[in-house]
From Swiss-Prot:
Gene3D superfamilies: 1.20.1280.50. It comes from Arabidopsis thaliana (Mouse-ear cress). Residues 33-79 form the F-box domain. GO terms for molecular function: carbohydrate binding. PROSITE patterns: FBOX. This is Putative F-box protein PP2-B8. InterPro entries: F-box-like_dom_sf, F-box_dom, PP2-like.
Length: 305
């Protein structure tokens, strides 16, 4: 079955459910796309809004009925964040856009929220929210000590300032986010986004313990893992007992490095008010560490780059 026929079949089932809800006959004509022509365009738009942005774009290329309905704000208002009006107020570029244009603008460019302490954008295919928590919004051990860390601007960063590690023995970073800020019923991955300076030491073959979980809940040992900021770690180090769970960093398209610190499932919903905490800690190797620049912690749906 071709993708187009699959989409027709998918929508045939949706239309039948909608017609039943609207007390319309579900037995007239064929059971294909043709029966959509019997429905008002607004109703077709509502139907499309219960799918995904990717499906909506495919359907727009399938038939004129879909193409017209997909242009409606009814469709795209369902895909953009509920607080889109406050997002618009923070950016002049968004002010005069249609809902569809706003959706794709938020896919292509992140917008600062929470007084510039977080960055929000949406994933183009499924409208899932992605968030980066800035270093300013993280709890960094000795972060207020000018001998240990300093806060500097970086033209390649999304935020006004980033955190440069000058020198510490205890390396600890903690970040929190409310589950309501991200998409419900979604598995997320969390990443530390950073750069290494030319003079960087103290992280060679050093395993940093990381954990991601819900605040107030006991974390299972399986939630814990180890990362290494040094991408040139040697094989002997990797073969150690905990080396099998050791995560290496990867280079991003924007020039920064990222390293995965864990995953979690966001149940979400109006009654769910969990705080998700992400921790990176290295306190066992009591030697000086220097030369990282931390932009923040990025949270995005698992398997999305």
């Amino acid at each position: 079955m071709t993708k187009t026929r699959c989409m027709h079949e998918h929508f045939r089932k949706i239309v039948q459910r909608v017609k039943k809800t609207l007390r319309l006959s579900a037995s007239d004509k064929s059971h294909g796309v043709a029966e959509l022509d019997d429905l008002p365009e607004e109703c077709v738009s509502i139907i499309v809004s219960f799918t995904s942005p990717q499906d909506a774009c495919v359907l727009a290329s399938v038939s004129k009925t879909f193409a017209s309905a997909v242009k409606s704000d009814i469709v795209w208002e369902k895909f953009i964040p509920p607080e889109y009006e406050s997002l618009i107020s923070q950016s002049r570029a968004f002010k005069f856009l249609s809902k569809k244009e706003l959706y794709f603008a938020l896919c292509d460019k992140s917008v600062l929220i929470d007084d510039g302490k977080k960055s929000l954008w949406i994933e183009k295919a499924n409208a899932k929210r992605c968030i980066m928590i800035s270093a300013m919004n993280l709890a960094i051990a000795w972060g207020n000590s000018p001998q240990s860390w300093r806060w500097i601007p970086d033209p390649q960063a999304r935020f006004e300032t980033v955190a440069e590690l000058l020198e510490v023995c205890l390396f600890e970073i903690r970040g929190r986010i409310n589950s309501r800020v991200i998409s419900p019923k979604t598995r997320y991955s969390a990443y530390i986004v950073y750069k290494k300076l030319n003079i960087c030491y103290g992280f060679e073959n050093v395993a940093v313990e990381v954990v991601v979980g819900v605040v107030g809940q006991d974390l299972e040992e399986s939630c814990r893992r180890y990362i290494c900021f040094d991408e040139t770690m040697d094989e002997q180090f990797r073969r150690r007992d905990r080396g099998k769970n050791l995560v290496k960093p990867e280079r991003r398209k924007d020039g920064w490095m990222e390293i995965k610190i864990g995953e979690f499932f966001n149940e979400g919903g109006l009654l769910n008010d969990d705080e998700i905490e992400m921790v990176a800690l290295e306190a066992k190797q009591r030697h000086w560490k220097r030369g990282l620049i931390i932009q923040g912690i990025e949270i995005r749906p698992t398997n999305i780059r």
